[in-house]
C-alpha cells in the first residue's frame, strides 16, 4: 500500500510493505509502507500488530528502517484488535518505532463502535475488561507522539457491522436506524414490505449478507440517506475536534457493489432528485409503475441512477474532508481505495480518481492485495498515474 496523492506532502512512489508480506522499495521522498489490513477480518489476529517482534513478522520489517528518505511516510495499519490493552499499545508503538515506521493508522471505528472515549457509539466488547477510563486512541496518541510517530484515526465509513456477529449493544446504529442500511437489489422488494423498526428487517438483511461472503463484508450505512451521512459526519467531526490526530483515514467509503443501494429511502431520494428534470408524461408513467415496482425509477433511468449513487458517495467524502480541515486544518485526509480506478468506479461506485482531481482527498492508499510482484507493481503504477505523481 502507498499514500498516493496530488498534494506535495502526500505524493508517493513504491516503498511499500503490504499486509500479505511483500516488500518493495524505492527512492521517492514521500513513499509509504503499510502492514495489517481490516479486509482480512476473518483472520484479523493474523494481521493484527500486537504480538510482534521483527522476527515474528511476515516480512523483515527491519528492512524498512534502511530506506533512505527523510520526508518519507512509512505507515502501518493497526487493527482494532491491537488496541485492547495498554500493554498491546505500548508494544505496537515500540515495534513500529524500532522497525522504522513513522506513521500509525489506528482503527478506532471498526464496526460502528468506538475505540476511544466519549463517542455516541458503543464501546466494543473487546474493551469491557478494561477500566472505563481506558482510552485506546488517546493512549496511542500519547505513546506514539512521544516516540516521534504520527497517528491517524482510521475510520470505517459505511461498513458498520458484521453480519455474522450482530452487535450486542442495543444502542448500536444497526438497531436504532436500520432504515439507514444499504440494501441489495436481490432482496429490496421483500425488505420493502417490512418496517425497518422490525427485527425481521435486520435479520433478513443479515442472513442474505452472510450468504454472500465473497461480495460483502457486513452491513453498510448508505451515503444516500441524509440522516446517515449526517451521523457519519458527526463521528468524524468529534474525532477531529477532541483528539490531536495527524490525520483521518477513511475506509469502506464505497458501496459493496453496484447492486446496492436499493433501499426505500435511497430510491425515494433518487426520485426526488430527478422528477423535475424528466417530462411530465414520463413522470406520471413512472409514478404509476412505482406503486407496484420499487425499481421503476432506477430501471427507467439507469445512467442517472448510477451517477446519482456515485455522486452521493463523493458528496460524503467531500463533506468529511471539509469537516476534518475545519476542525484540524493540518490533518491529512486519506482513503483506502480499490487499486483499479476503473473497477472502483464501475463496480464499487467509488470515484477516487475524481476525488483526487477535485482535491476532495489528500492521498489514497490503493488496496493492492496480491502475492504477485508484477501485478502489485502494475497496480501501484496505475494508481500513481491516475494521481499524477
Residue ranges with predicted function:
Residues 47, 59-86:
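Boundary/entry segment of secreted carbohydrate-active catalytic domains
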Residues 104, 144, 239, 251, ...:
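Conserved, mostly hydrophobic/aromatic
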Residues 67-75, 81, 158-242:
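Active-site-adjacent "subsite" loops/lids of carbohydrate-active enzymes
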Residues 88-113, 361:
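Catalytic domains of carbohydrate-active enzymes, especially glycoside hydrolases
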Residues 112-156, 310-327:
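Aromatic-lined substrate-binding rim segments of carbohydrate-active enzymes
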Residues 83-97, 228-238, 343-357, 376-380:
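Short, acidic/polar
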Residues 74-83, 120-134, 215-230, 301-312, ...:
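The substrate-binding groove and active-site-proximal loops of carbohydrate-active enzymes
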Residues 273-389:
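Glycoside hydrolase catalytic-domain groove-lining segments
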Amino acid at each position: 500500500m502507498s499514500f498516493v496523492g496530488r498534494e506535495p506532502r502526500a505524493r508517493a512512489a513504491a516503498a511499500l510493505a503490504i499486509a500479505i508480506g511483500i516488500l518493495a522499495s524505492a527512492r521517492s521522498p514521500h513513499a509509504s509502507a503499510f502492514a495489517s489490513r481490516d479486509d482480512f477480518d476473518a483472520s484479523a489476529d493474523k494481521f493484527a500488530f500486537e504480538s510482534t517482534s521483527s522476527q515474528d513478522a511476515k516480512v523483515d520489517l527491519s528492512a524498512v528502517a534502511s530506506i533512505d528518505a527523510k520526508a518519507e511516510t512509512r505507515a502501518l495499519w493497526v487493527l482494532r484488535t491491537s488496541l485492547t490493552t495498554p500493554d498491546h499499545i505500548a508494544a505496537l508503538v515500540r515495534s513500529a518505532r524500532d522497525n522504522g515506521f513513522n506513521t500509525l493508522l489506528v482503527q478506532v471505528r471498526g464496526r460502528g463502535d468506538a475505540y476511544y472515549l466519549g463517542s455516541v457509539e458503543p464501546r466494543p466488547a473487546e474493551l469491557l475488561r478494561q477500566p472505563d477510563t481506558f482510552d485506546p486512541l488517546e493512549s496511542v496518541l500519547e505513546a506514539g507522539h512521544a516516540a516521534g510517530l504520527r497517528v491517524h484515526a482510521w475510520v470505517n465509513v459505511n461498513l458498520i457491522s458484521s453480519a455474522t456477529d450482530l452487535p450486542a449493544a442495543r444502542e448500536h446504529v444497526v438497531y436504532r436506524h436500520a432504515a439507514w442500511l444499504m440494501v441489495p437489489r436481490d432482496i429490496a422488494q421483500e425488505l420493502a414490505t417490512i418496517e425497518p423498526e422490525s427485527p425481521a428487517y435486520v435479520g433478513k438483511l443479515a442472513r442474505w449478507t452472510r450468504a454472500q461472503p465473497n461480495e460483502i463484508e457486513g452491513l453498510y450505512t448508505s451515503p444516500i440517506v441524509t440522516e446517515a451521512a449526517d451521523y457519519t459526519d458527526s463521528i468524524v467531526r468529534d474525532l477531529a475536534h477532541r483528539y490531536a490526530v495527524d490525520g483521518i483515514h477513511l475506509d469502506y467509503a464505497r458501496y459493496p457493489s453496484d447492486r446496492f443501494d436499493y433501499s426505500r429511502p435511497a430510491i425515494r431520494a433518487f426520485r426526488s432528485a430527478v422528477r423535475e428534470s424528466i417530462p411530465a408524461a414520463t413522470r406520471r408513467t413512472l409514478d404509476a409503475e412505482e406503486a407496484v415496482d420499487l425499481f421503476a425509477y432506477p430501471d427507467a433511468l439507469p445512467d442517472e441512477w448510477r451517477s446519482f449513487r456515485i455522486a452521493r458517495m463523493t458528496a460524503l467524502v467531500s463533506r468529511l474532508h471539509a469537516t476534518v480541515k475545519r476542525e484540524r486544518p493540518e490533518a491529512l485526509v486519506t482513503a483506502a481505495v480499490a487499486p483499479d480506478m476503473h473497477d472502483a468506479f464501475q463496480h464499487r461506485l467509488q470515484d477516487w480518481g475524481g476525488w483526487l482531481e477535485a482535491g476532495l482527498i489528500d492521498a489514497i492508499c490503493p488496496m493492492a492485495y496480491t502475492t504477485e510482484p508484477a501485478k502489485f507493481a502494475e497496480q501501484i503504477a496505475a494508481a500513481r498515474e491516475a494521481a499524477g505523481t
